[in-house]
């Protein structure tokens, strides 16, 4: 087999292969982009992958209305422009959007609460696809349900488009705290926890035995500064998604480079001090506490 064929096999196929491709992004930063020019900036700044969508989450909030999958021709343009993986967002439960993204060549599909939910009851059956999926979660039970459906990567939901990292921290702490509790439980107690929380029993035991999720777990939702990115890595995340925080900043190139540097040096305060001096003014934020319940995106798709 050629090197190209080996990479293609890693990108698509079995559950193990899909998880392997997702794991290749570990330790990196994935940046939201709306066009090929932004994708080039993200790649030059050190992103390990880009996530294409029609508008960044902060603009989706401002615009209102129905947020849908972006034009797949734009995704194809970005694939031609950059050498890093290109991901695309589909609405929760919208199988057809995910099929289109896969056909367009998306390296990974994000079944995303940032877009308007298409199905109030069911998520996409991600096992039916060859492209890997990433899904958001606020707690361990949500994460394990998404993995059971075939997700190859989990991310915190946070509260996208706000520039407020509070909810991303809360969701990551929720997941870590529950894993710690499971580790200290007897086998029968884990079974009871699975029943009480509506989580797949098999995955509950696997998570407890591993001491972590069975798939990579990234931070997302409200990450707007290098310090935010470092904080989430310190909380045990495997990598970072940054949405509005890059191209909503005064200098996207500098902000992108600084976020990548912060992830690479998250446990070195001296390095972080220097990194924090460079990026310029960040995006204008909105505190989570100021959002009405109907304005919150994180409750979509439990």
UniProtKB/Swiss-Prot annotation:
Role noted for this protein: Catalyzes the formation of pyridoxal 5'-phosphate from ribose 5-phosphate (RBP), glyceraldehyde 3-phosphate (G3P) and ammonia. The ammonia is provided by the PdxT subunit. Can also use ribulose 5-phosphate and dihydroxyacetone phosphate as substrates, resulting from enzyme-catalyzed isomerization of RBP and G3P, respectively.
Keywords: Lyase, Pyridoxal phosphate, Schiff base
Gene name as annotated: pdxS
Any one biological process term the GO annotation gives: amino acid metabolic process
Assembly and oligomerization: In the presence of PdxT, forms a dodecamer of heterodimers.
Chain positions recorded as D-ribose 5-phosphate binding sites: 32, 161, 222, 243-244
Region (Disordered): 275-302
Database matches in PANTHER family: PYRIDOXAL 5'-PHOSPHATE SYNTHASE SUBUNIT SNZ1-RELATED
Active site: 89
Name of this chain's protein: Pyridoxal 5'-phosphate synthase subunit PdxS
One Gene Ontology MF term: pyridoxal 5'-phosphate synthase (glutamine hydrolysing) activity
Gene3D superfamilies found in the cross-reference section: Aldolase class I (3.20.20.70)
Pathway annotation from the record: Cofactor biosynthesis; pyridoxal 5'-phosphate biosynthesis
Catalytic activities: aldehydo-D-ribose 5-phosphate + D-glyceraldehyde 3-phosphate + L-glutamine = pyridoxal 5'-phosphate + L-glutamate + phosphate + 3 H2O + H(+)
Chain sites annotated for binding D-glyceraldehyde 3-phosphate: 173
Lyase in keyword set: yes
Annotated InterPro entries: Aldolase_TIM, PdxS/SNZ, PdxS/SNZ_N, RibuloseP-bd_barrel
EC annotation from Swiss-Prot or TrEMBL: 4.3.3.6
Family listed: Belongs to the PdxS/SNZ family.
Organism encoding this protein: Haloarcula marismortui (strain ATCC 43049 / DSM 3752 / JCM 8966 / VKM B-1809) (Halobacterium marismortui)
Upper classification of the organism: Archaea, Methanobacteriati, Methanobacteriota, Stenosarchaea group, Halobacteria
């Amino acid at each position: 087999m050629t090197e190209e064929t080996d990479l293609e096999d890693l990108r698509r196929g079995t559950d193990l292969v899909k998880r392997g491709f997702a794991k290749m992004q570990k330790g990196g930063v994935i940046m939201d982009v709306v066009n090929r020019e932004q994708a080039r900036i993200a790649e030059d700044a050190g992103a390990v992958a880009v996530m294409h969508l029609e508008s960044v989450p902060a603009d989706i909030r401002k615009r209102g209305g129905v947020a849908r999958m972006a034009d797949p021709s734009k995704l194809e343009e970005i694939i031609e422009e950059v050498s890093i993986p290109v991901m695309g967002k589909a609405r929760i439960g919208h199988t057809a959007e995910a099929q289109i993204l896969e056909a367009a060549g998306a390296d990974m599909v994000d079944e995303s609460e940032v877009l308007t939910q298409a199905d109030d009851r069911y998520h996409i059956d991600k096992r039916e696809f060859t492209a890997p999926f990433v899904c958001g979660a606020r707690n361990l039970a949500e994460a394990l349900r998404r993995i059971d459906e075939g997700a190859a990567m989990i991310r915190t939901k946070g509260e996208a488009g706000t520039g407020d990292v509070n909810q991303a921290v809360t969701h990551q702490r929720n997941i870590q705290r529950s894993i710690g509790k499971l580790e200290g439980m007897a086998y029968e107690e884990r079974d009871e926890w699975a029943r009480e929380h509506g989580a797949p029993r098999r995955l509950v035991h696997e998570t407890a035995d591993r001491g972590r999720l069975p798939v990579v777990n990234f931070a997302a939702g409200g990450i707007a500064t290098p310090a935010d990115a470092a904080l989430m890595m310190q909380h045990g995340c495997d990598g970072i998604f940054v949405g509005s925080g890059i191209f909503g900043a005064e200098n996207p190139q500098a902000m992108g480079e600084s976020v990548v540097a912060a992830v690479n040096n998250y446990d070195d305060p001296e390095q972080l001090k220097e990194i924090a001096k460079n990026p310029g003014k960040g995006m204008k934020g909105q505190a989570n506490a100021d959002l009405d319940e109907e304005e919150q995106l994180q409750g979509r798709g439990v």
